[in-house]
Design a protein with these regions (language model features):
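Membrane-water interface at loop-to-transmembrane-helix junctions
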Residues: 7, 170-182, 204-225, 233, ...
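Hydrophobic transmembrane alpha-helices of secondary-active transporters
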Residues: 15-20, 38-65, 83, 91, ...
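Membrane-embedded alpha-helical segments of transport systems
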Residues: 76-85, 117-125, 139-160, 180-186, ...
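Structural signature of hydrophobic alpha-helical transmembrane segments
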Residues: 35-49, 105-120, 175-188, 243-255, ...
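The feature identifies polytopic integral membrane transport proteins across all domains of life
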Residues: 67-75, 96-117, 135-145, 205, ...
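Single conserved hydrophobic/aromatic residue that forms the stacking wall/gate
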Residues: 1-6, 10
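Interfacial helix-loop-helix linkers and transmembrane-helix boundary segments
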Residues: 28-34, 54-74, 133, 170, ...
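Entry/N-cap segments of selected transmembrane alpha helices
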Residues: 60-90, 94, 175-179, 232-262, ...
Length: 337
């Protein structure tokens, strides 16, 4: 654990140094985006989730209706609990615990950024966390796809209700591109690859040999993703060290709380581990591309609200990797008699 934590610190330091000392490289990569989505980040996410998508068997997708409890847990936690606990936890810390260091105006915008993060469950990275916890690939795809559909009609009303902001709108281009880039394209590529390899060399070769060629893809992709995030956001960290820490506290507490809530409920209702782990991960992680896009549109690029969503990006990978370790250690608890 110590070596892993040290490794994470080194990756962050490398990213910050690259962004600081090679601003030209950072600027070039920053320009490679479409609809608010970073193309380099998209490529790295593809590298991480493509192996999982190859494991998706459409026959198993048809059988998900026989065990819908995992979907119900995901929907209830993500939409009826998570946005409101985020509002409560963030309000308590920004307006009460940290009032000595954060002015009311800043606290209000930090709260807005936190709520934007809490109101949209993750799309792309859930596939990575599911892979690392050996989650059910087909079930994870349905969990993510169904939540993306709910975002279309639930995100705006929830944000308006919690923040009292009237001019909230979903950047549909960002949402659409995220679904296409992180669900449709890798899923199609994975299924086509599976069909072609199985047809040519058989199921045994595909499962025992071919899939293992991609065993290190997720690890390499995660390492590069962490470096890239801290390269993009390095200046933010260096310019606002205290506020970064203060914003991170409620975000991290919320992440752990939502994970253990969903994961624990799955244990109580006796769901298998490969459904429970992704159910906990999808609620714990956030759709930060969407949150950042809305924060920038509502409050501006250099606003405290945008900074809060950026902190969500910074904390996402290290915190979720910790939850992956915890989930894997608790796997034995999901063996029922």
């Amino acid at each position: 654990v110590r070596s892993s934590a040290a490794s994470d610190v080194y990756k962050r330091q490398i990213g910050i140094m690259l962004g600081h000392f090679l601003p030209g490289m950072k600027e070039a990569l920053n320009h490679l985006e479409y609809a608010g989505i970073s193309i380099p980040m998209a490529v790295l996410i593809w590298i991480m989730i493509y192996p999982m998508m190859m494991k998706v068997d459409f026959k198993s997708i048809k059988n998900i209706g026989k065990n819908p409890k995992g979907l119900f847990v995901t929907w209830i936690v993500n939409w009826l609990i998570k946005p409101f606990t985020m509002y409560g936890i963030a309000s308590f810390f920004f307006f009460v615990v940290f009032k000595t260091w954060i002015t009311p105006d800043f606290a209000t915008e930090y709260l807005a950024g936190a709520v934007l993060l809490g109101a949209a469950p993750c799309t792309a990275m859930v596939f990575v966390w599911s892979t690392l916890t050996k989650g059910n690939p087909a079930y994870t795809v349905v969990q993510v796809a169904s939540n993306d559909i709910i975002i279309l009609f639930a995100f705006v009303p929830i944000v308006k209700f919690l923040l009292g902001v009237s001019n909230v709108s979903v950047p549909f281009q960002t949402l659409f591109m995220s679904v296409v880039l992180f669900v449709v394209i890798p899923l199609a590529a994975g299924i086509i690859t599976r069909l072609l390899v199985v047809r040519k060399k058989g199921t045994e070769y595909f499962e025992q040999t071919f899939l293992h060629k991609f065993d290190s893809a997720t690890t390499v992709g995660l390492l590069l993703t962490l470096i890239l995030i801290f390269m993009f956001q390095g200046e933010v960290v260096l310019d606002n060290p205290l506020h970064i820490i203060l914003i991170a506290v409620p975000l991290i507490i919320q992440t752990f709380f939502i994970f253990f809530l969903a994961f624990g409920v799955c244990r109580i209702i006796r769901l298998p581990y490969d459904i429970a782990a992704p159910a906990g991960m999808i609620g714990a992680s956030n759709f930060f591309e969407l949150a950042v896009a809305v924060a920038v549109a509502l409050f501006g690029t250099s606003s405290p609200a945008a900074l809060a969503t950026t902190v969500g990006v910074l904390t996402e990978v290290p915190v979720m990797l910790t939850l992956v370790k915890i989930a894997n250690k608790l796997k034995e608890k999901f063996k029922y008699e």
